[in-house]
Amino acid sequence: MDLYKIQQNILRKAKIDPQKVKAWIYDNQSIVFDFLLNDYFVSISYSTSGQSFNFIERNKSKVSKISIFPKFLKYISEVYGSYPQSVNQEKTALSFKFAEADWAKIEDKFSKILEVTSIYLSSELCYILNVEKNKGINLAEYLDKPEVEYIGVKGDGNEFFLSYARNHGLSDYVYELNNKGFLAVEHKMGVSVFRRVNKHSYKDLLAYFSDSFHELENVIYTVEAPKVLSANKKNLLVLFSYTNKSNENMVDRYYSHPFPFISNSIMPNTYIIRMADVSDAFGSHGLNTKFDENIEDNIQRFIKSLMSIYGVDKKNVVICGASSGGTGAVYHGLIGGYKTFAIDPFLGNHKYYGGKDPLYLHSIRTPILETFKKLPDVIDHNLENQVVISSAKVSEFYPDIKELKEALPTVVLCEFDFEKIQKHIDFSGNTVFLSNTIINNLLLDIHITDSDINL
């Protein structure tokens, strides 16, 4: 008994769109078909050991509180009411017995079930595309369809597609998803689900974040109120997230909760804002992308709106970030004229990645290196507020930082020489004491000068 051959026979008989179903065999005993309904999955299978058809809701939608699945189960229960059935208490699974020795009859029954399912769920069914198996597929043909809000994408493996693609020569598909405004919001059953983003309403994405997140000026963020708040001047510390984990959880991917304990050592009256870098595959370091040309303006408006909400003067605002978060901090601090502290920021040295692009930064509208080379020509060299960068000569990012310093001498550079720092990745964790000192000095308006620190 060849279950794979039987499965193909079922697909041939069923009058359904083969691009809207994923077919696989479980444990050499179950024929399984998965359907994607926006951001959640429904599976229909036939178990050879249990001789039963099974209908299962694999996960819950994060955006829709009302699922069509319970109604679908009720419909299936009525259509196949003549067979012995069982439904779980949560109404996320239904089975009915179909004991039949003739596989041709099982194929006919299964193909009919697939047709019934496809018709009932048609309005919510989404494409599931294996871009590795079907290498000639034109992904743009699907992404350009205005009715496509969600799409499932996978390779031959079951790994999260953003990770899988960069290791299997499929990065061009990720660039295409980025440039069309599709972000990964789920991964289940070996399929990564991408959702079309409305670049004028990032608030729509809050469903994928916890209740502690907010949206303002198309920026998603958290706020940590001052532990001590008095009538004296109020301060604002805006923290950029650095690139985080590669998985389907948007919080893990776009938000790193930078400086988690800074509130224990910050001066009173300081609101701490932590921004999520929600764009492209792993964020855009606070810069415009080929899809969204408004990110930089959104962030500048965001900071000004925060100042207005909390009653903070510009001179009492400090922007901060480390590594890729430092990229956004330096850029927005310079163009906005804010006090800034950046820890070993990435300024476009792609040699660090060995000539590869694991973070899909080629989807950024202007290459980062080019952006920072042009920046000195478009900002005021007489910086009203201090911009401080810390780095180490052994860091892979140091040459670009030094070049920016030469183009903008008013930028303050704190250079480290410390045996525990041998490369970029060592820097942030070994300089917490300095970071806290510099941030507090900026908040207190204490002047900082270039320094060469040997430890």
Model-flagged regions — what are they?
Residues 40-100:
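Intrinsically disordered, low-complexity regulatory segments enriched in Ser/Thr/Pro
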Residues 272-294:
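Cap/lid segment of the alpha/beta-hydrolase catalytic domain
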Residues 289-309:
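Alpha/beta-hydrolase active-site loop
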Residues 312-322:
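Alpha/beta-hydrolase fold nucleophile elbow
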Residues 355-417:
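The feature captures the conserved acid-bearing segment of alpha/beta-hydrolase catalytic domains
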Residues 410-455:
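C-terminal catalytic histidine-bearing segment of alpha/beta-hydrolase fold enzymes
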